[in-house]
Amino acid sequence: DYIIQIDETPVFGLTLNEAVELMRGKKGEPIVITISRANTEPFEIEIIRDYIKIRSVKSEVLNNIGYLRITSFNEQTESGLLNAIKKIEKENKIKGYVLDVRSNPGGLLTQAVKVTDIFLERGEIVSTRGRDKKDIRRYRAKKSDRTNGKPLVVIIDGGSASASEIVAGALQDHKRAIIIGTQSFGKGSVQTIIPFQVSNSDNLTGIRLTTARYYTPSGESIQGKGIVPDIIIEQGEFESFDYKRFSESDLKDSLDKNNEEDVEENEDNELSEFEKRLEIDYQLRRAFDLVQGVSLFNETQE
């Protein structure tokens, strides 16, 4: 389905932000959107405006390592990420961070730039380049690293696209983070819709043209190539081994336990939902291991 009109205004030629702005209004007010669907005539749907809260950032802490999951890049992503980091740093002695943008299809370019800026001190984040060599726009880091240079591992996969690739590519080029997982999608084009009206008709139509491409700080095009991880880790199954649960009774020929009946708690109930996820998410487990290893190495160098 395609939204082709919002109330009386055609959306052809509008940017995403402009179209979203047209949809906004007071809670409870009606809005009519016109939908185009294959093999059917355009039809109208009336909906009632309401508050929509999309939480694009989720966070957890395990073994003093902060986990930051970004599911999309919307207008609240930067503030959500900053709040998550602030809370994590306040309540824990953090060794490093895991940033997870797997299956993140992207979103707002401005938010991708701001999110990257949270982890960088300086330097270029991304550039857009058109056919004309003079048609170049560069986005640079403006703020200091909010995580104070702590070890950072970013997880990507084939579902990481657009804004996700901008973040991963910039952090990789500046050697600020280690990128793991699998090659990203490769959506690095800037597209513009040019509207026009068909002669002898009241219908508006348009042509969507690729007018520019995204480039990482090192000058690599994201389009069609994607971001190749520093360490390629396929998602797979593995047999979990938790050193916390290993004891002498697990050793061969160890002494028997006392004959007294022990009341054992169900270990599964002791694990948080996030710890259970670590048990089955191979890429995530390796990311935590990597942050732990880099943190230990850095401590030996101090």
Predicted regions and their residues:
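Beta-strand scaffold of nucleotide-dependent catalytic cores
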Residues: 45-47, 209-210, 219
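Short acidic, Pro/Gly- and aromatic-enriched capping/linker segments at domain boundaries
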Residues: 196, 203-213
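Conserved functional hotspot residues or short segments at active or partner-binding sites
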Residues: 213-302
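Cleft-lining beta-strand/loop regions that shape enzyme active-site pockets
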Residues: 4-197
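Aromatic-patch recognition
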Residues: 189-191, 208-211, 223
